Amino acid sequence: LGHHSYSHPNGWWTSKKKYLADVDKAAALIPSNLFRPPYGRLRIDQHLSLKKKGFKIVFWTVVSYDFDPELRKKDLIRKMKRLTRPGAIFVFHDNPKAVPVLKNELPKLMAYWKEEGYTFKSIPNN
């Protein structure tokens, strides 16, 4: 389990000081050194400071857009299947907009991936 900041700041538009304070606020609630930058946007000064603080920065390969009510579930499933590769890191969200997908579609995807021979692993904290 990792975290994603406290208030979801865009690293490109947020000062290093504010960004790091936001990450620290989240880290106080979720004690993990795994961190995924919101929007995948992180400046080099923020990246270096986070690394110095001991964070392991983890990016992703596919965003599910599970929060988008306009995206049809069958299109989401098709997209996830098409973009599956060994080592892929998918982003799913744990917010109210994404609950229908998490409850209904994610189990179907996980069953599909297992049938295809994929396994699920945690990202190590070190």
Task: Kindly label every feature range from the protein language model.
Residues 13, 17-20, 40, 74, ...:
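Soluble non-cytosolic domains of exported or imported proteins
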Residues 33, 41, 47-83, 117-126:
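His/Asp/Glu-enriched short active-site or ligand-binding loop at hydrolase and phosphoryl-transfer sites
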Residues 63-65, 95-98:
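Short Gly/Pro-enriched loop/turn and capping motifs at secondary-structure junctions
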Residues 100-126:
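C-terminal domain-boundary segment and adjacent tail
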Residues 6, 16-44, 48-51, 78-93, ...:
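CE4/NodB-like, metal-dependent polysaccharide N-deacetylase domain
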Residues 44, 98-99:
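Short glycine-rich, flexible loops that bind phosphorylated cofactors or substrates
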Residues 8-14, 66-68:
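A short acidic, helix-capping loop that chelates divalent metal ions and anchors anionic groups
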